[in-house]
Design a protein with these regions (language model features):
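Long, low-complexity interaction regions most often at the N-terminus
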Residues: 1-86, 90
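Short amphipathic alpha-helical segments that mediate assembly, nucleic-acid/protein binding
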Residues: 12-16, 38, 98, 110, ...
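Intrinsically disordered, low-complexity serine/threonine- and proline-rich regulatory segments
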Residues: 87-103
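Positively charged, polyanion-binding regions of nucleic-acid-associated proteins
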Residues: 102-124
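Major-groove recognition helix of helix-turn-helix-like DNA-binding domains
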Residues: 144-163
């Protein structure tokens, strides 16, 4: 099924750059019905507010393609009760939904960072850890500044302290 519209989500510049780097230069995410992100998007679809304006500066925004969800689903609770969601009218993601999607993408970046660091980690010297963090930021076109490096190194040190015995890369089948 083809999707017909997109919804804009404010995620911040760093997440925008990460999505563009992982998505072949595009800031539009194409979803599958079986993903967690589609579940979050579908829960938070809403009608356009009256004060909605078209976004000119897209440096902090990504777009999510809305799948065709024009279908009837009958549930066993009450007879003849159907849910009908049409993305023609529900093409806006609420503020709470945008925050949930931003948190989900932040967790995905954090998981990708930890897997990257586990694969690059050798003996744990501070200079090598900072170099690995810098190469992660440059590989995913994220801005390199002291605040982000300090935040990621703090996250890595806490993760390493908590999971000192588990330095394997997870493999999913």
């Amino acid at each position: 099924m083809k999707s017909s519209s997109t919804a804009d989500i404010k995620v911040g510049a760093a997440i925008h750059n990460w999505v563009v780097a992982n998505n072949g230069g595009s800031d539009v995410i194409r979803l599958d019905r079986r993903t967690n992100l589609w579940g979050i998007v579908k829960q938070n679809l809403d009608t356009l507010p009256n004060d909605y304006h078209i976004i000119q500066d897209r440096s902090e925004y990504i777009a999510v393609e809305l799948l065709d969800v024009r279908q009837h689903k009958t549930y066993n609770r009450t007879a003849d009760r159907e849910i009908y969601i049409n993305e023609l009218y529900r093409c806006y993601i609420s503020e709470a939904g945008q925050a949930a999607i931003r948190r989900y993408l932040e967790n995905q970046i954090r998981a990708a960072f930890r897997v990257y660091m586990i694969s690059r980690y050798s003996d744990g010297q501070d200079e090598q850890i900072r170099h690995a963090i810098g190469s992660f930021l440059s590989d995913f076109d994220l801005p390199i500044n002291n605040q982000i490096i300090a935040r990621l190194s703090k996250d890595w040190y806490r993760y390493r302290q908590k999971n000192i015995e588990k330095y394997e890369i997870p493999i999913f089948f």
